[in-house]
Each structure stands twice: as structure tokens, then as C-alpha cells.
């Protein structure tokens, strides 16, 4: 019986690398996979999943308006789909999570989702919230803070290198804008940013 998996982490834990390896494993056995990534993520070439170690794969794009369930079923009618892999799944909506649950339950296709658990404020993304609630399997992919502890938070920085603790949830960027840290160093950076803001008023 197919299951819905949520592989989550902070940034730079190898989520895309893990997705690409899983897709390769299916393909090597002659099985067809569908790979999705978020249209909003413009860090790399559009229509591709790219890993920091240089691996890449073509991908179907999704926006918040995409009916992923219908798209998967149409592809499955053309040629059997053995597994669906979704990168940047934190950008999925509640309705889209419901759609992929139905794909798993009624079409018997495993769905592997890879994404961030929380944003730079430490708050859940909508997609992550419902995957944490509804996925059959939750798998944490680990990365480390500069101190060596497990990194479970993401800091966002402004153009001058100062930590930011408010603003829009989505602001696409890479290592120049975000860094994964442990809770202790996240709180220290945020408290310092709040202190500096207060001092400048």
C-alpha cells in the first residue's frame, strides 16, 4: 500500500539530493517517476530540481493554482507512474496536500515530499503544517549549525548581514540570504537584532 512521506529539515540538509537519489533508484529499476518543484523558486533553472552537489533533474512546475492530483492522474493514464517526488513542498496549499493524499490512498502511488518545516520566524509553512499532520511517515533530514549542534532553524539576513525577524514569509534566496542554525544561536541572533532595532529608535 502506497504512503505519503514528508522529508523535512532546515536549509542545506540535502533535501534535493535525497529526492534526486530516490528518483534515480526508481528509474534504475525501469520505473517511472514524476518530479515536481515550485514555480516560485527561481534560484536555479526553471523546470529543474537542482542539488548543491551538482545533480539535477527535469521537473514539472506547480503553483498554488495547480491541481496536482489531476496532473498526476493524467500522467498515470499515459504511462504508469511508480512514484511522485515533490521538492519545495512547503509551498503547497492545504488543498494540494489533500490532493496528494488522495493520489496515495486511491491511486496507490507513493508520494515523497521534501521541504522546510519552518520559516525564518520559526513558524510553519502551510504545506509543512498539513504534511506534519497528514503524512504517513515523517523523516527529519539533519544538518548542522556552525557550532556543531543540529540546525533546526533558519535565519534570514538583510543586505548588510543583520538578522531579520519580521517581513514576508516567502523571499526566495540562497546562502547569501539564509543560514541554518541551532535554536540557541537563532535566539541569540534574533535578540541581538531586536536590541539593535530598539537602540536605533
From Swiss-Prot:
Q: Which residues cross the membrane?
A: none
Enzyme class, top EC level, equals transferase
Give EC number(s), comma-separated.
2.7.1.21
Cite a single GO BP annotation: thymidine metabolic process
The molecular function GO annotations come to: ATP binding; thymidine kinase activity; zinc ion binding
Give the UniProt entry's GO cellular component terms: cytosol
Which residues make up the binding site for Zn(2+)?
145, 147, 182, 185
Question: Which catalytic reaction applies to this protein?
Answer: thymidine + ATP = dTMP + ADP + H(+)
Q: Which NCBIfam families match?
A: PRK04296.1-5 (NF003300)
Describe its assembly.
Homotetramer.
What family name appears in the similarity comment?
Belongs to the thymidine kinase family.
State what protein this is by name.
Thymidine kinase
